[in-house]
């Protein structure tokens, strides 16, 4: 059995297959998944699993160079934003880029996968751009 926090087979496979610059999106329950992009659906019910827990567990195995947020999160979601600020300051999320929510949905077309959570707070979405460990 694995020693790291991430136990989900599909997520472990995804992270192991990433190359530098590949995009992984973690989305709330309402984020549309573009046709042709792999969906890894973790949602069980409202709030389970939540956005931040999913992100923290994914970061236990994924090297992130930078991340993208919809600028709407800055005004509409102070609690998740505070946690993201801490992760950014700690170096876990790399550099930040902001764009409007509609552009974020366009960016998600380039993702290797969209991970759907049970999060029901709007704009709790993040695009993670894979980095390298060397």
Curated annotation (Swiss-Prot):
It is found in: Cytoplasm. Keywords: Carbohydrate metabolism, Cytoplasm, Isomerase. The keyword Cytoplasm applies. Pathway: Carbohydrate metabolism; D-ribose degradation; D-ribose 5-phosphate from beta-D-ribopyranose: step 1/2. GO terms for biological process: D-ribose catabolic process. InterPro entries: D-ribose_pyranase, RbsD-like_sf, RbsD_FucU. Catalyzes the interconversion of beta-pyran and beta-furan forms of D-ribose. Belongs to the RbsD / FucU family. RbsD subfamily. This is D-ribose pyranase. It comes from Pseudomonas fluorescens (strain ATCC BAA-477 / NRRL B-23932 / Pf-5). The lineage of its organism: Bacteria, Pseudomonadati, Pseudomonadota, Gammaproteobacteria, Pseudomonadales.
